Curated annotation (Swiss-Prot):
Its main location: endoplasmic reticulum. This is ER membrane protein complex subunit 4. Isoform 1 is expressed in brain and heart. Isoform 2 is expressed in heart. Disulfide bonds: none annotated. The chain crosses the membrane at residues 67-87, 99-120, 128-148. Residues 88-98, 149-183 are lumenal. It is found in: Endoplasmic reticulum membrane. Component of the ER membrane protein complex (EMC). GO terms for cellular component: EMC complex; endoplasmic reticulum membrane; membrane. The keyword Glycoprotein does not apply. Residues 2-66, 121-127 are cytoplasmic.
Length: 183
């Protein structure tokens, strides 16, 4: 018997982590037993009955909205380095490729400026919507100014009086150069 009793006692120590649901108390412990001082409570350490509001999620959402609004506002400014590279690669000759590049460089900011009210609606949830709208507007105007500059460097803009009046002679070139040599 002692061997049998020792085995039961050993088994009890070995599986101390197990919850004994059958026994003198009926095995059902609720929230009322929590403060009874029993060592093997059903609740983990640090458990609270009341729900704690999570403010970090609201703060994270607000930060993400601000970040997204700044991404929208800075979008046109991020396109300017690529437009500068395209302007450089297209050259100043009047042909189909540079003309299409200039048209696209001018059309994108014009299209964005025509749809600026829809963009401002996306920025309404931000606390810095006026500054973001101003940055968006300046970025699009800079893109448009780059397109106008490229048109002027290609000679597509009428900048001389001879472009407007038929009786005025166009300006004469003083010299022609090619490949670094004077012709």
């Amino acid at each position: 018997m002692t061997a049998q009793g020792g085995l039961v006692a050993n088994r009890g120590r070995r599986f101390k982590w197990a919850i004994e649901l059958s026994g003198p108390g009926g095995g059902s412990r609720g929230r009322s037993d929590r403060g009874s001082g029993q060592g093997d409570s059903l609740y983990p350490v640090g458990y609270l009955d009341k729900q704690v509001p999570d403010t970090s999620v609201q703060e994270t959402d607000r930060i993400l909205v601000e970040k997204r609004c700044w991404d929208i506002a800075l979008g046109p400014l991020k396109q300017i380095p690529m437009n500068l590279f395209i302007m450089y690669m297209a050259g100043n000759t009047i042909s189909i490729f540079p003309t299409m590049m200039v048209c696209m460089m001018a059309w994108r900011p014009i299209q964005a400026l025509m749809a600026i009210s829809a963009t401002f609606k996306m920025l309404e949830s931000s606390s810095q919507k006026f500054l973001q709208g101003l940055v968006y507007l300046i970025g699009n105007l800079m893109g448009l100014a780059l397109a106008v500059y490229k048109c002027q460097s290609m000679g597509l803009l009428p900048t001389h009086a001879s472009d407007w009046l038929a009786f005025i002679e166009p300006p004469e070139r003083m010299e022609f150069s090619g490949g670094g040599l004077l012709l």
